[in-house]
């Protein structure tokens, strides 16, 4: 099987959420959604890898469409395949995106490349027929991934109409769903108000949570 990328699609959409933290108003934030369309077929369906950029970083449609997607599509298909020629090579695709770029992180550029990179890895795992965590463990570890990871619930954002009771209900709902650690946002109100918000939360959470 010889795999190639047929298309890299990007759309920029508003997050359209009324929440905010100390720095960002998410009602004005956008995000990029990327689809890497391949000619591979798995279980009767064309393989498409999907990626999106994290909230807190704006959509990168301009960079993706004008610089990075064209470089992938202009590259010789064989130059983007792995050594077995039966899957894509994310590292070669990353190198293709970085052609004619000055080395370094450089802010927004890393978001654009990272969003495509996420979609590429999603496609690679689908072509391989494995969950991505298993694929990464097979390639870069002992093939025995830890199936339990530390997670926490981030909440307590600021939004219109929020009161202490709603804040308490929100944070308690995370504990009720099994989270052992929760985090709330601070810095978006006065120090006195933030302290009152923290006190309200501590009334409904156990010590150390």
Task: State where each predicted segment sits.
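Structured beta-strand/loop patches that form or line metal/cofactor-binding pockets in enzymes
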Residues: 1-61, 67
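Metal- or metallocofactor-binding catalytic centers and their adjacent structured scaffolds
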Residues: 41-127
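General structural feature for long, well-ordered alpha-helical segments within catalytic domains
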Residues: 64, 89, 93, 112, ...
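Glycine-rich, aromatic-flanked loop segments that form ligand/cofactor-binding clefts
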Residues: 111, 117-160
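Broad gene-expression machinery/nucleic-acid interaction feature
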Residues: 31-33, 115, 148, 181
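Metal-dependent enolase-superfamily TIM-barrel catalytic cores that perform enediolate-based chemistry
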Residues: 141-209
């Amino acid at each position: 099987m010889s795999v190639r990328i047929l298309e890299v699609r990007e759309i920029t959409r508003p997050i359209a959420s009324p929440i905010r933290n100390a720095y960002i108003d998410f009602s004005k934030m956008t995000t990029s959604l990327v689809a890497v369309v391949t000619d591979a077929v798995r279980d009767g369906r064309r393989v498409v890898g999907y990626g999106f950029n994290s909230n807190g970083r704006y959509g990168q449609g301009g960079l993706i469409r004008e610089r990075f997607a064209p470089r992938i599509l202009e590259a010789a298909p064989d130059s983007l395949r792995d050594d077995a020629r039966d899957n894509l090579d994310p590292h070669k695709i990353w190198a293709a995106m970085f052609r004619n770029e000055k080395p370094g992180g450089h802010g927004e550029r890393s978001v654009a490349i990272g969003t495509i990179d996420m979609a590429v890895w999603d496609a690679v795992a689908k072509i391989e027929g494995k969950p991505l965590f298993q694929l990464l463990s097979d390639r870069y570890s002992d093939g025995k991934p830890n199936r339990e990871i530390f997670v926490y619930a981030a909440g307590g954002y600021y939004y219109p109409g929020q009161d202490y009771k709603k804040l308490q209900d929100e944070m308690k709902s995370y504990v009720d769903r099994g989270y052992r650690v929760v985090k709330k946002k601070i810095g978006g109100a006065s120090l006195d108000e933030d302290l009152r918000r923290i006190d309200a939360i501590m009334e409904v959470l156990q010590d150390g949570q």
